[in-house]
């Protein structure tokens, strides 16, 4: 079957790889000159299935009000003037109760755990390199309340069979030795030994090269203007004066998927702006070993070979990609607070990207009401964590095979009332 994939971020390229391995003739289209040059370029670098959790959580509405007055707040909201943003935020608020949180986290962990297994299999099969580490993830708590709240998430981990350790502050250095110097600032941590880390952009670009060698065609520097539909099927992708045709089409444009599908399929995917720093390592014994998550500031600090990636925060501000100095200061503050000798912060590279987020935090993966239009988008802050599993799942569904995990609740059908955002003219094109 001929398949066109729209988008060459980590999700789009993973989809291309698994569809090619299933015997399909795959073409990937993207406006950028190469793979992983937008949202997949400089994310936090963590592959953390056990920490897969929606931003829509109990207590978040009240916290959001407090965060409005804090300098280093993990979440910020600025109205973009669209009804879609208001509807999206209302849907998110409706998911902030305990029952919805547990349901959403459960299916997110399910997909993320499966994805980690798919990544392991891919690594064993291809020996793909991406500065990966298998040292686990450590969530750090600065208050007793955070430590106590961890028991809620532990219940979900136990149900999913995810191993964990709940550590008091005196034991944190057993996992991350450099934290011995700052243990007095912390109340404890939750460690998940099976989690991994790695450079998402490096992985995506290497996988794209492998996919191309296996027969996948990449059409870079090719902005997409429109999906062409007739009745209940898509019959082409309009790119300038050219119409590219296939038997099936996969939407993996990330945050730009919603606007591109306007008038065809309503999906609840909105951009969640995040930031990162990439820092050269200064002192080896003062740097992280793997990944830590600062629960207070919602910031991850991840170790690559000779670099530290610091990423996090969430801004609900539309498609604004301005680099804001106060956000850089927050990232610098957290990494200096926890790893004061770890990196040359003054040499850091500052970056921002738009993560495609659904109100319930779970991506939309599967077929739409159009028989040949498929979705693989809405992974939020977990695109790297969920990419391989989502790609394999999509390949199985499109190929008529039974997936290895339950998948019905990942469909866009769970949003039965639909979303209809405006389509800004400047959003035409692919998203990576």
Swiss-Prot record:
Gene3D superfamilies: D-Amino Acid Oxidase, subunit A, domain 2, FAD/NAD(P)-binding domain
Descriptive protein name: D-amino acid dehydrogenase
Keyword set, alphabetical order: FAD, Flavoprotein, Oxidoreductase
Named cofactor requirement(s): FAD
Alphabetical list of NCBIfam families matching this protein: PRK00711.1
GO cellular component assignments: cytoplasm; plasma membrane
One MF annotation (Gene Ontology) recorded for this entry: D-amino-acid dehydrogenase activity
UniProt binding sites for FAD: 3-17
Name of a matching Pfam family: DAO
Keyword Oxidoreductase (UniProt): yes
Taxonomic placement: Bacteria, Pseudomonadati, Pseudomonadota, Gammaproteobacteria, Enterobacterales
Cysteines joined through disulfide linkages: none
Pathway given in the UniProt record: Amino-acid degradation; D-alanine degradation; NH(3) and pyruvate from D-alanine: step 1/1
E.C. number(s) listed in UniProt: 1.4.99.-
Role, per record: Oxidative deamination of D-amino acids.
């Amino acid at each position: 079957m001929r398949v066109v994939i729209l988008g060459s971020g980590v999700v789009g390229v993973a989809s291309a790889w698994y569809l090619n391995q299933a015997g399909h003739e795959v073409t990937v289209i993207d406006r950028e000159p190469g793979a992983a040059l937008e949202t997949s370029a400089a994310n936090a670098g963590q592959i953390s299935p056990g920490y897969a959790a929606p931003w829509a959580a109990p207590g978040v509405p009240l916290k959001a009000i407090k965060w409005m007055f804090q300098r280093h707040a993990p979440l910020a909201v600025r109205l973009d003037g669209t009804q879609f943003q208001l509807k999206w935020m209302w849907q998110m608020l409706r998911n902030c109760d305990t029952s919805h949180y547990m349901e959403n986290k459960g299916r997110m962990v399910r997909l993320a755990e499966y994805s980690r297994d798919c990544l392991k299999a891919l690594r064993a099969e291809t020996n793909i390199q991406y500065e990966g580490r298998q040292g686990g993830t450590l969530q750090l708590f600065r208050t007793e309340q955070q430590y106590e709240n961890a028991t809620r998430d532990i219940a979900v981990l136990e149900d999913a069979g995810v191993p964990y350790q709940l550590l008091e502050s005196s034991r944190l250095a057993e996992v991350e030795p450099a934290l011995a110097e700052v243990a007095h600032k912390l109340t404890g941590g939750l460690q998940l030994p099976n989690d991994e880390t790695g450079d998402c952009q490096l992985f995506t670009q290497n996988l794209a090269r492998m996919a191309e060698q296996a027969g996948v065609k990449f059409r870079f520097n090719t902005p997409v203007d429109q999906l062409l539909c007739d009745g209940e099927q898509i019959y082409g992708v309009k790119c300038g004066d050219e119409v590219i045709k296939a038997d099936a089409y996969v939407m993996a444009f990330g945050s730009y998927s919603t606007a591109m599908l306007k008038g065809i399929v309503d999906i609840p995917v909105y951009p969640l702006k995040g930031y990162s720093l990439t820092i050269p390592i200064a002192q080896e014994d003062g740097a992280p070993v793997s990944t830590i998550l600062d629960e207070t500031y919602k910031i991850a600090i991840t170790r690559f070979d000779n670099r530290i990636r610091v990423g996090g925060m969430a801004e609900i501000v539309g498609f604004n990609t301005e680099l804001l100095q106060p956000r850089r200061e927050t990232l610098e503050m957290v990494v200096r607070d926890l790893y004061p000798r770890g990196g040359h912060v003054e040499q850091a590279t500052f970056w921002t990207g738009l993560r495609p987020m659904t109100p319930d935090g779970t991506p939309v993966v599967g077929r739409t009401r159009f028989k040949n239009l498929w979705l693989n988008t809405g992974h939020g802050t977990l695109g790297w964590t969920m990419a391989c599993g989502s790609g394999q799942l999509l390949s199985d569904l499109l190929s008529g095979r039974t997936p290895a995990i339950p998948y019905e609740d990942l469909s866009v059908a769970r949003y039965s009332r639909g979303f209809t955002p405006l389509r800004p003219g400047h959003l035409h094109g692919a998203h990576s």
